């Protein structure tokens, strides 16, 4: 699901940049892979903000995705890696029509206990590393440095 959102947009944008500057298909592939992995990392970071950030900190409504019944990576991981009773509890909380702050805190606590946040943070780093590896073959340059800094910024960004 995340690949159909932000990742595909960023990947296509990066590949278009390469198309306008070179005929080398390997450059196009590298920039596409860079963009796809950066996009995946960006979306995961956004998913984490939804659970772990406050609106004042991130500019994003805390729990907004859950309130809209959107299933994001931390939830997917927990639903796939929990006991039947944990899964039932999580589904009940997420499907609740009215999601109070107390309800959202309980969802966050359960995701934390089940390892959903740690898993998502690890995947964020994994996709970030893949983005940098995709452009590893490029000569060192200001442009390459900028692309690497963009990946690093995404990992550490607070908004």
Question: Where are these predicted regions, by residue range?
Answer:
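All-alpha prenyltransferase/terpene-synthase fold signal
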Residues: 1-159
């Amino acid at each position: 699901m995340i690949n159909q959102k932000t990742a595909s947009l960023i990947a296509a944008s990066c590949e278009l940049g390469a198309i306008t500057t070179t005929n080398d298909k390997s450059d196009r592939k590298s920039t596409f892979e860079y963009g796809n992995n950066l996009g995946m990392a960006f979306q995961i970071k956004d998913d984490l903000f939804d659970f772990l950030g406050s609106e004042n900190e991130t500019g994003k409504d805390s729990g907004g995705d859950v309130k809209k019944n959107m299933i994001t990576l931390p939830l997917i991981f927990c639903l796939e890696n929990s006991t039947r009773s944990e899964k039932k509890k999580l589904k009940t909380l997420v499907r609740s029509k009215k999601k109070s702050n107390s309800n959202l805190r309980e969802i966050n606590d359960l995701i934390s206990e089940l390892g959903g946040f740690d898993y998502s943070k690890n995947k964020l780093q994994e996709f970030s590393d893949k983005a940098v590896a995709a452009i590893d073959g490029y000569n060192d340059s200001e442009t390459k440095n900028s692309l690497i800094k963009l990946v690093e910024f995404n990992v550490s960004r607070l908004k």
